[in-house]
């Protein structure tokens, strides 16, 4: 089984061909392709990491763009009556891994 560890949006994801992965927003249109930098490649018993994995390219197709669940942030100060509520939704992209080369 061939899989790769890629860096996407400040995080690392384990992917193989055909996987659907949700990442932070990717600057590409729906249906467009994007390349993700590989940190490690595992092909059976062969493992490439570091400088050996620098030439490995992982390509993915953007399936859709969406927004994540709302996260509510509350600030509260005791005895003063101060409270503040703020919400945030992350911009996300779903991509399908099309190739590891």
Curated annotation (Swiss-Prot):
Keyword Iron-sulfur annotated: no
PANTHER family registered for this protein in UniProt: 50S RIBOSOMAL PROTEIN L21, LARGE RIBOSOMAL SUBUNIT PROTEIN BL21M
Keywords, ordered alphabetically: Ribonucleoprotein, Ribosomal protein, RNA-binding, rRNA-binding
InterPro entries named among the record's database cross-references: bL21-like, bL21-like_sf, Ribosomal_bL21
Protein's job: This protein binds to 23S rRNA in the presence of protein L20.
Keyword RNA-binding listed: yes
NCBIfam families xrefs: L21
MF terms (GO), sorted A to Z: rRNA binding; structural constituent of ribosome
Top-level taxon of origin: Bacteria
Protein name per UniProt: Large ribosomal subunit protein bL21
A Gene Ontology BP annotation from the UniProt entry: translation
Upper taxonomic lineage: Bacteria, Bacillati, Actinomycetota, Actinomycetes, Micrococcales
Family membership noted in the UniProt record: Belongs to the bacterial ribosomal protein bL21 family.
Gene Ontology, cellular component aspect: cytoplasm; ribonucleoprotein complex; ribosome
Organism: Micrococcus luteus (strain ATCC 4698 / DSM 20030 / JCM 1464 / CCM 169 / CCUG 5858 / IAM 1056 / NBRC 3333 / NCIMB 9278 / NCTC 2665 / VKM Ac-2230)
